Amino acid sequence: MRRLLLELKIAGINFPLVTAALSLALVLFAALAGELLDFAPIAFEVVFPLYAAIAVGEWARFRSDAAFEAIAAQSPARFPWMLWRFFAVFAAVSLLAFATMLAAACIRPGLALEEMLLLYLPTAFFLASVAALVGGLSPQEHLPTLVCGLLWLVALLTRSLLRLPGVEYVYPFLRFAGDQHGVWLWSKAALAGIGLLLWAALGLLAEKPPKAGPAFTTPLHKPDRKSVV
């Protein structure tokens, strides 16, 4: 528990403030939106998973952390540290997402809490795992957010690909796009499995020692013997 609190403290004050603001905005949206709006897929399959990925990319920094070299030198293994930092940020976002679900269920009695959880958790875990993998491989700041944002946007713009066989099983926003064959639970299970595979890849690559660069021990210009006194 102390480790989680320490990681959240490192994340800074902006993280809980922005997350709480998003939760409040979605609660207001649930109260003001009409009854014909399918609120659960929009809020918990599309919006909150994207924010979970952004939070991991921006506040659970791995190689882009300024202290990464010191942490890597002092830690016996890098992967457990990455896992703790990811879990701290992802769990905090998920707790506020759950609080938003409870508030939305009170405002809109037709919403099912179990359905909202199943819409959110696998999708958010998949996108956040993509952000974690990119952050664990690249020291470039904001690159995980960029990659996840592009993936999110491309997925929304390519809903027509659902006509192809098999695409619906890996499409991250199937309920939002329209589940024609009732396979959205299988789709969420596939997303969770892909997220675990991404973490397995990160675990293998995180502990891989960096490749040694070329040696520069030989001087570029040999000193002139005549100039040596």
Q: How would you describe each model-predicted region?
A:
Residues 70-79:
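Short helix-to-coil transition segments within interhelical loops
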Residues 6, 66-69, 116, 132:
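Positions in alpha-helical segments
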Residues 24-61, 83-148:
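Secretory targeting signals
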Residues 115, 174-187:
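Membrane-interface segments at the starts/ends of alpha-helical transmembrane spans
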